[in-house]
């Protein structure tokens, strides 16, 4: 994993998380920590280990991490502005994923669909594991009749990072209702779309888990490794929040899973020399 040039300016944990929560690729640092499990960390997307990370905030009570700064430089700018504390003063962060999303939303309010698509695409390029930006992009592709890119975006909206944001019911509905285009008719997610509702918890049996397992297994087989690892982590995250009896019935042990996933992601979570 590529470390930022100014890495010496933060007090860094030396071990990258394996998952489930915090997710794989999250590296905790101590500046601006609020305690009680709320702190910041560097985060590398799956497939972007050779790029500098963004900065995410771990929000313990919600069980998520949230993209907060587009780079460590931007975090440090904010941190210094707030007298080296967690303060209320804000900075401009043009490359943050939410900034592009908001610009896209503004364009939609002005009925400028093509410009909105540009900003939504920029948001996915800025950070590609957020369900919302892919769904915003998908919706506009649908609006202009671009079915191929609509379906590609829906796939990315579902196989996003659920430790950051869980796909909305609108995403699931769009997935289930689509008729796959020829180029995507054999995609593992689209082939299994009718069997997924992504409802978890409070059930004695839940077929979603077996379907998801089938999907990420096939993604591994066809060489889409980054999406496979992301979806496998999502599977484990949902299973992690289930009751212990549910886990036992489904032969899931978080420690066993972490051990195996650590091996799968070993090359990914190896840091460049500090």
Question: In which residue ranges do the predicted regions lie?
Answer:
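A surface-exposed partner-binding patch
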Residues: 1-47, 107, 114, 125-134, ...
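Alpha-helical tetratricopeptide repeat
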Residues: 94-108, 135
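Inter-repeat boundary and helix-capping residues of tandem alpha-helical solenoids
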Residues: 86, 93-94, 127
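A structural "flexibility-hinge" signal
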Residues: 54-57, 100, 111
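Compact, glycine/acidic-enriched structural inserts
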Residues: 51-88
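Low-complexity, intrinsically disordered
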Residues: 111-114, 118-119
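Short, solvent-exposed loop/turn segments at secondary-structure junctions
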Residues: 33-36, 48-49, 60-64, 80, ...
């Amino acid at each position: 994993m590529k470390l930022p040039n100014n890495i010496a300016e933060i007090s860094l944990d030396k071990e990258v998380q394996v998952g489930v929560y915090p997710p794989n690729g999250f590296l905790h640092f101590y500046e601006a920590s609020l305690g009680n499990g709320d702190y910041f960390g560097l985060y590398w997307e799956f497939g972007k280990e050779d790029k500098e990370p963004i900065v995410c905030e771990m929000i313990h009570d919600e069980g998520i991490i949230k993209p907060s700064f587009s780079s460590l430089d931007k975090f440090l700018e904010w941190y210094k502005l707030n007298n080296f504390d967690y303060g209320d003063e804000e900075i401009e962060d043009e490359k943050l994923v939410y900034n592009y999303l908001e610009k896209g939303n503004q364009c939609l309010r002005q009925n400028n669909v093509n410009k909105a698509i540009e900003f939504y695409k920029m948001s996915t390029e800025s950070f590609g594991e957020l369900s919302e930006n892919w769904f915003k992009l998908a919706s506009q592709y649908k609006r202009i009749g671009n079915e191929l890119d609509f379906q590609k975006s829906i796939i990315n909206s579902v196989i996003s990072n659920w430790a950051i944001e869980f796909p909305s019911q609108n995403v699931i509905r769009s997935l289930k209702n689509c008729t796959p285009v020829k180029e995507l008719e054999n995609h593992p997610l689209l082939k299994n779309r009718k069997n997924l509702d992504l409802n978890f918890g409070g059930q004695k049996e839940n077929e979603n888990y077996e379907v998801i397992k089938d999907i990420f297994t096939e993604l591994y087989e066809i060489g889409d490794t980054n999406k496979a690892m992301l979806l496998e982590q999502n599977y484990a995250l949902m299973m992690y929040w289930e009751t212990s009896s549910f886990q036992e019935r489904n032969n899931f042990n978080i420690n066993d899973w972490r051990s195996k996933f650590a091996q799968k992601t070993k090359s990914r979570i190896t840091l460049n020399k500090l």
